[in-house]
């Protein structure tokens, strides 16, 4: 499958002690090919519970191409949790802490009773996902499913233990000796 092939050949960048994989799905570089987006969206649709879902939710930035593609395939609108405040009525601020940053995310466009599916590009520490879940619960949404394309590290397990939600992923990876390894 193209997702796994492109992960195995993607560049690795070391920052401090951490090795980052640079991939079109997680970083938008070097080039996001339409066939890769189609494959990922098709795989998400196959494993996802979209029944009754009226909104797809992601956090900026790299979830945006994924939810746009999914929205076009499913005709379900999407909502993006943003890193900046808009001060719109009903806006829900939530603190986000990841392995590389801390800050606020802001949720708009969700109403009590909305049935949502959360989509994200990568889950590694779980910080972003916990923030998304907290914001959606505060807004009164019903989370029907959670899917992350790439799983790395213990974030999936951490989120599942802290929130009680199960997270589906398309591929689990690690970086070993400067290369992505599919687990």
Swiss-Prot record:
Compartments (UniProt record): Cytoplasm
Cellular component aspect of the GO annotation: cytoplasm
Catalytic activity: IMP + diphosphate = hypoxanthine + 5-phospho-alpha-D-ribose 1-diphosphate; GMP + diphosphate = guanine + 5-phospho-alpha-D-ribose 1-diphosphate
Claim: Repeat is one of the keywords in the record: no
GO annotation terms (biological process): IMP salvage; purine ribonucleoside salvage
GO molecular function: guanine phosphoribosyltransferase activity; hypoxanthine phosphoribosyltransferase activity
UniProt-listed InterPro entries: HGPRTase-like, PRibTrfase_dom, PRTase-like, Pur/Pyrimidine_PRTase
Family, per entry: Belongs to the purine/pyrimidine phosphoribosyltransferase family. Archaeal HPRT subfamily.
Function summary: Catalyzes a salvage reaction resulting in the formation of IMP that is energically less costly than de novo synthesis.
Subunit-level organization: Homodimer.
Stated name of the protein: Hypoxanthine/guanine phosphoribosyltransferase
Organism (species): Methanocaldococcus vulcanius (strain ATCC 700851 / DSM 12094 / M7)
